[in-house]
């Protein structure tokens, strides 16, 4: 599941103690890829995206065939991207509500509106480019996971979800097919493939996939 339970203070303390232990290991042996990976996992569990990504990258630098480091780095990069976007959305909502207070009238006010619009457009383009770059980084990590371990079903599933986020439904369906081929009872893959097919106008097969997901236990997770 993608839902994560909040950690208790005691659990957080355990992870930070573990981080200290891994740090000591790294100090003794700076080339220990497993220590970087372990420390990354602890950072991941305390929701420190940046440090987790940094440590997964350190593990990969020392062991370029470290499949799970690529996979978890992709997961963390996506979580960081989603968090950043949610924070920006909150800020944009606040800015929008605040902008309603500006009731200036006249040429100077109109000029300011035009200038703000121009800045907003440039800002939106920069955000789109940054998001595209971040999606590409995540995609490359999943590509590497699949290259190193072609049977890793969740790499196909997560890559398919990323492609849906990019609205590349055709490519997403191909990846969902690969996931389902490797795990014929993967309910979430049927469900998401059904949504992707519906987005393409493939209604009959889309509904069939949603029904299959329901048979496999997804029905109660997605009530009407």
Language-model features, listed with the residues they occupy:
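Alpha-helical tetratricopeptide repeat
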Residues: 1-224
């Amino acid at each position: 599941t993608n839902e994560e339970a909040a950690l208790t203070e005691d659990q957080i303390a355990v992870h930070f103690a573990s981080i200290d232990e891994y740090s000591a290991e790294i100090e003794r042996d700076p080339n220990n890829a497993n220590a970087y990976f372990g420390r990354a996992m602890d950072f991941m569990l305390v929701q420190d995206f940046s440090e987790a990504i940094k440590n997964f990258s350190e593990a990969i630098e020392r062991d370029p065939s470290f499949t799970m480091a690529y996979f978890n780095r992709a997961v963390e990069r996506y979580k960081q991207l989603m968090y950043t976007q949610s924070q920006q959305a909150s800020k944009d909502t606040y800015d929008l509500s605040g902008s309603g207070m500006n009731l200036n009238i006249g040429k100077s006010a109109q000029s300011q509106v035009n200038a703000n619009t121009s800045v907003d457009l440039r800002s939106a383009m920069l955000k789109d480019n940054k998001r595209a770059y971040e999606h590409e980084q995540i995609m490359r990590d999943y590509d590497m996971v699949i290259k190193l371990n072609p049977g890793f079903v969740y790499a196909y599933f997560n890559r398919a979800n990323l492609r849906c986020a990019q609205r590349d439904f055709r490519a997403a369906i191909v990846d969902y097919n690969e996931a389902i081929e490797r795990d014929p009872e993967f309910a979430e893959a049927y469900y998401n493939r059904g949504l992707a097919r519906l987005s393409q106008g493939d209604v009959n097969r889309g509904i069939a996939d949603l029904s299959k997901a329901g048979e496999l236990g997804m029905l109660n997770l997605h009530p009407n």
